[in-house]
Design a protein with these regions (language model features):
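Short, well-ordered beta-strand elements within core beta-sheets of diverse protein domains
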Residues: 103-112, 144-151, 206-210
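Short proline/glycine- and acidic-rich turn/helix-capping motifs at secondary-structure junctions
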Residues: 107, 174-187
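Short, solvent-exposed beta-strand edge segments and adjacent coil->beta transition regions
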Residues: 68-70, 143-145, 202-206
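Conserved PLP-enzyme active-site core in the AAT-like
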Residues: 1-133, 138
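PLP-dependent enzyme catalytic core of the Aspartate aminotransferase-like
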Residues: 113, 181-227
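Hydrophobic side chains in well-ordered alpha-helices
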Residues: 83-84, 155-159, 217-221
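Conserved small-domain helix->loop->beta segment predominantly found in fold-type I
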Residues: 122-173, 192, 196
Length: 227
């Protein structure tokens, strides 16, 4: 049996206590898999907390430049590793040498990028919380991922189209800042009643904050949200 979590969650930024979840899973004979994409190893290391397997979309923060498509699976259990390696060897989902090089290059600046995106995100959160057009900001206090709800959801197309620096796109974790509308992008395939029941309302936008000059990002958001 498997318990699979991501923490913080996408896009509602809910954090789980990995150690408690691991203990509960192991008590039932299940293994715990943690998606650590949002925090990266800089801000969270699930295996010492009891996770059996950790996965990353390496396309995101690990590579960090929106130019690699890759995934990472990590375990410290030899039996699990042997099974995973057998599957890897027999099915062949390996990265090309160039993609591997790009990912390794990105890892060299991971700590710097995570710290800068966090620094920028904290300033942007402080800015968003003061805007009359924004009714709620969802942020854990670290990392570059922010979600927020707007007062008037009918203005979301205008907000997105008014941005000059921040790009409208589904991805995240790169050096460039992106904005996503979960209703029509990441969660478009989920039935509306299910999506709404989990709090993924139509007024919700998600930001992936990059490493640009934070004043430029704030000016861009101010122009779009006050237009």
């Amino acid at each position: 049996d498997i318990v699979y979590i991501e923490t913080p969650t996408n896009p509602l930024m809910v954090e789980f206590d990995i150690e408690k979840v691991a203990n509960a899973a192991h008590a039932k004979g299940a293994k715990l898999i943690v998606d650590n994409t949002f925090y990266s190893p800089i801000y969270q290391n699930p295996i010492p907390l009891g996770a059996d397997i950790v996965v990353h979309s390496a396309t995101k923060y690990l590579a960090g430049h929106n130019d690699v498509l890759a995934g990472v699976v990590i375990t410290n259990d030899k039996e699990t590793y042997d099974k995973l390696f057998y599957n890897l060897n027999t099915t062949g989902p390996t990265l090309s040498p160039f993609d591997s090089y790009m990912l390794m290059r990105g890892l060299k600046t991971l700590k710097l990028r995570m710290e800068k995106s966090t620094e920028n995100a904290r300033e942007i959160v402080a800015f968003l919380e003061k805007l009359p057009a924004v009714k709620e900001v969802l942020y854990t206090g670290k990392g570059g991922m922010i979600s927020f709800r707007v007062v008037d959801e009918s203005k979301i197309p205008d907000i997105i189209n008014s941005l000059d620096i921040i790009t409208f796109a589904e991805s995240l974790g790169g050096v460039e800042s992106l904005i996503t509308y979960p209703r029509t992008q990441t969660h478009a395939d989920i039935p509306e009643e299910v999506r709404l029941s989990y709090g993924l309302t139509n007024d919700l936008l998600r930001l992936s904050i990059g490493i640009e000059d934070v004043e430029d990002l704030i000016d861009d958001l101010k122009h779009a949200l006050e237009a």
